[in-house]
Amino acid sequence: EPNMDALIIPVTMEVPCDSRGQRMWWAFLASSMVTFFGGLFIILLWRTLKYLWTVCCHCGDKTKEAQKINNGSSQADGTLKPVDEKEEAVAAEVGWMTSVKDWAGVMISAQTLTGRVLVVLVFALSIGALVIYFIDSSNPIESCQNFYKDFTLQIDMAFNVFFLLYFGLRFIAANDNLWFWLEVNSVVDFFTVPPVFVSVYLNRSWLGLRFLRALRLIQFSEILQFLNILKTSNSIKLVNLLSIFISTWLTAAGFIHLVENSGDPWENFQNSQALTYWECVYLLMVTMSTVGYGDVYAKTTPGGLFIVFFILGGLAMFASYVPEIIEIIGNRKKYGGSYSAVSGRKHIVVCGHITLESVSHFLKDFLHKDRDDVNVEIVFLHNISPNLELEALFKRHFTQVEFYQGSVLNPHDLARVKIESADACLILANKYCDDPDAEDASNIMRVISIKNYHPKIRIITQMLQYHNKAHLLNIPSWNWKEGDDAICLAELRLGFIAQSCLAQGLSTMLANLFSIGSFIKIEEDTWHKYYLEGVSNEMYTEYLSSAFVGLSFPTVCELCFVKLKLLMIAIEYKSANRESRILINPGNHLKIQEGTSGFFIASDAKEVKRAFFYCKACHNDITDPKRIKKCGCKRLEDEQPSTLSPKKKQRNGGMRNSPSSSPKLMRHDPLLIPGNDQIDNMDSNVKKYDSTGMFHWCAPKEIEKVISTRSEAAMTVLSGHVVVCIFGHVSSALIGLRNLVMPLRASNFHYHELKHIVFVGSIEYLKREWETLHNFPKVSILPGTPLTRADLRAVNINLCDMCVILSANQNNIDDTSLQDKECILASLNIKSMQFDDSIGVLQANSQGFTPPGMDKSSPDNSPVHGMLRQPSITTGVNIPIITELVNDTNVQFLDQDDDDDPDTELYLTQPFACGTAFAVSVLDSLMSATYFNDNILTLIRTLVTGGATPELEALIAEENALRGGYSTPQTLANRDRCRVAQLALLDGPFADLGDGGCYGDLFCKALKTYNMLCFGIYRLRDAHLSTPSQCTKRYVITNPPYRFELVPTDLIFCLMQFDHNAGQSRASLSHSSHSSQSSSKKSSSVHSIPSTANRQNRPKSRESRDKQTEKKWFTDEPDNAYPRNIQIEPMSTHMANQINQYKSTSSLIPPIREVEDEC
């Protein structure tokens, strides 16, 4: 009876397949064996017959060939024999079979899209059949199943039908059918496909050898190579090892599961044991590892024999494969891999100097919440794996940031990050490196590598030294017209500082404009409240509505400010030949065209949309600017999409030039070309400007001619000048002082308006910089050290307009807190100095300027306008100073009376808000700003460099020096560009608005009357207090609202038009070219101390002293120089302290020209 029970298979009432319980496993196995051996017999029989046919017919073929040769002459007429027709038919048949075979080969080799789909589908279905086997392994080995009711059997049947078709394709494509029949994949099909058809016929299922489907895993690596997923040798090897190991393991477990659950046939299947498939997997693992716990073991004879042989092979495989797999995985780069581009999402590649500081600053600005539509993924590529802090930063931004380890100098790594499909590549520089030239060389090599791999990729790179920008022009595929940009940190940071010498606080305002800053609301009435309201403003660009077409720039600017609450400072103008240029406050001569885009200062990108949506018909009566939205009128803006915003790059296809990069666009008023008097007096043989007409120029001077000793400098009273205190030695890295001097020598200043520049520092260092400075006028050198007070007194630092403190030794110190020690010590040294007040009060160049026409003084007194200035400062605290810092946290040491927390961000500190401190880190925001709008960089460079153009850079790249040019109408036309100035409200035509007036009224009056565009206020820090304060510190307010109340001591930032007539009155004062050379010793900022009260004797005494000492400080004065008049007037010390040393210009502004009201 027990024997009978062992023979009975499970029988259900619905499916009475065998009432006797007879096993039918042999039928399933026989189907596979018959298929295999039957096919093998047919192949061998076919080959044998084919061989015999070939041997037998070999002699007959030779006889036919002989007959053909003998009868060839009789067929000279060209007719074909029937034999030829038969041969053509045979050839056609062979060709058809060959084409079918080739097609089948292509289908299984994944050379086409259909083939790749087929290969992947076969593998996927094989894994699916294996999963079905795993599911069925929980059932008995043999059971009754109805095909029409068993869902898994139906799926398995469908899979095997597909395998049968695929087997046919493989058979057709096989070059050798015998070897194909013996392949592993063929054997798998023989023992898995036929049993399924037998199952349908017998209505019963046998688990059998279906586990052989696991052997398909061996092809996993091959399929991944077909799909071009695996490319590296390590990845291919790793997948091969894993697939062979796992497939062998699963297949062996399937065999143990079959024999152990079936039992020995010769024992009448009585020694079977119920083991699940996963217990067999466990058994094989402990067997391979030779652990053998004994909890599970084989009881059947086939199982035991299999285990004996499996230990031999399995142990060898386990001992060799597992260590190799672990080694490959362990040595595999954590940040290897390749970037997978997401459809519909752009990505950029960031490389170069990748550190926690540089990446955090970049991500903070790039992913700022104000950029609400940034759909860009950031891919960092660096050859060093990130440390734990940087890795944590990447994980915090994992949705938008990925890191890959590699080098941009390796084309394979560039392919990994998909540089060819990247929207741009950004290269960061190490601002604190010891060797800036070496760092620039590294970045240039990165550019060369990237451009060599993909010439069309847009690159934005940081450069440290200005002279290294020239090397980028040597790269053939470098094209700034297509968006390639080089952000030169030396050029910009020194340009910002130079503009602060002309209008103190401007560096802070510009830095806040191109960086994204969140609005921080402060309720109490302090200077922080108004400063932070301005910090929330940024620079945006947007197309102008068609309602502005035909109006002049001042009219549109006023309308935007008054009605739309937007401040427009520049436009992108497209000339007739479609060349695009940025024009800053171009004046009333220019009319707005269709498709013109404007540059706006606003707090939100949504606000700027008002300029695009504005419709005169629909919005003319609206007073609330928030209600200005897209109306139903059919306008041109509806047809042309708005693409200019801070979040979208501007690609116009034209040239991105500075306002004066080309003289093609000229004023349409008679002031553009010099008057007849100027042309008559203009000596065409005298070079006063460089060849582009953008900067004042003089013949190269030897450095010995501009060097003065301390005693010689003390004999000359300098006033209204710029003192540059520089720390450096013979081996220090060059700062690039040319970038500081060039903005101060811009040609839109008249010669008498140029501030004299005095360098105080090591002569060994300045000799290295002199090659780039010897073409600029009004430059002097005092060898010494800025820490010596005697040197500072010798250059009259208490009478200067600005003291700049720079250091070339900042990056040679490992301790970051000590990097700025020299600059901080010099700043504190100056602030602690005391000065004598015995000279009196000098009415000289003022903090602001007063428009001409308000002062009817004589020509001799005409240069003297505006506010009164106290030159004899009693304490160094009131000296205007701007200090450059490397480490932002060191800003806390500059002001001893501030309450800034050491952890306060730089832009929130008092020294930065007051414009007395500048750090190169604020320029990091330019990378993001340039990517989203490449015209922003052009605008910033135009404002801070004084007019540097691509043409000028090409010239400097050629000669590394400015080339002198003759004064022609074309070069003089380039002088006609606006500049930044500060307008005083204490007196002059705007004095009535200074006492409680409205900023909006001042804006409109200045714009209509003088074409001056106001954009900010430089206000005393304690102006909001009801009680008077002795503090002379000021802070910056950017773009105040219309109703903002003014105070008399305010200084207004404005964009001032070039005055063509200011130079003519000066020329009328000049004498002959020989006699004027003597008077030229009296520059606009140099006053000698008289030995007597007789003022007429001063030029002669100075001339005689020059002959005796043979020291010529100013040998390059123009012929129209004039002696400066000094008037002594009493003045209250309190008022002087509030308004002194904040002078940006002493120029006369153009005559009053009323602007027509076009609104």
UniProtKB/Swiss-Prot annotation:
GO-annotated biological processes: adult walking behavior; cell maturation; chemical synaptic transmission; circadian rhythm; eye blink reflex; inner ear auditory receptor cell differentiation; intracellular potassium ion homeostasis; locomotor rhythm
RCK N-terminal domain ranges (all copies): 345-487, 719-863
Motif, Selectivity for potassium: chain positions: 290-293
Phosphoserine PTM positions: 645, 658, 662, 858, 862, 1101, 1104
Covalent lipid sites (S-palmitoyl cysteine): 56-57, 59
Annotated spans, Segment S10: 912-932
Modified how: Phosphorylated. Phosphorylation by kinases such as PKA and/or PKG. In smooth muscles, phosphorylation affects its activity. Palmitoylation by ZDHHC22 and ZDHHC23 within the intracellular linker between the S0 and S1 transmembrane domains regulates localization to the plasma membrane. Depalmitoylated by LYPLA1 and LYPLAL1, leading to retard exit from the trans-Golgi network.
Span list, region Segment S7: 494-514
Segment S9, as annotated region: 717-737
Annotated localization: Cell membrane
Entry-linked Pfam families: BK_channel_a (PF03493), Ion_trans (PF00520), Slo-like_RCK (PF22614), Slowpoke_C (PF21014)
Segments on the Cytoplasmic side according to the record's topology features: 46-116, 174-177, 224-238, 327-1159
Biased composition, class Low complexity, residue ranges: 1066-1091
GO molecular function: actin binding; calcium-activated potassium channel activity; large conductance calcium-activated potassium channel activity; metal ion binding; potassium channel activity; voltage-gated potassium channel activity
Compositionally biased region (Basic and acidic residues): 1100-1115
Domain notes: The S0 segment is essential for the modulation by the accessory beta subunits KCNMB1, KCNMB2, KCNMB3 and KCNMB4.
Family designation: Belongs to the potassium channel family. Calcium-activated (TC 1.A.1.3) subfamily. KCa1.1/KCNMA1 sub-subfamily.
Subunit details: Homotetramer; which constitutes the calcium-activated potassium channel. Interacts with beta subunits KCNMB1, KCNMB2, KCNMB3 and KCNMB4. Interacts with gamma subunits LRRC26, LRRC38, LRRC52 and LRRC55. Beta and gamma subunits are accessory, and modulate its activity. Interacts with RAB11B.
UniProt-recorded name of the protein: Calcium-activated potassium channel subunit alpha-1
Organism (species): Canis lupus familiaris
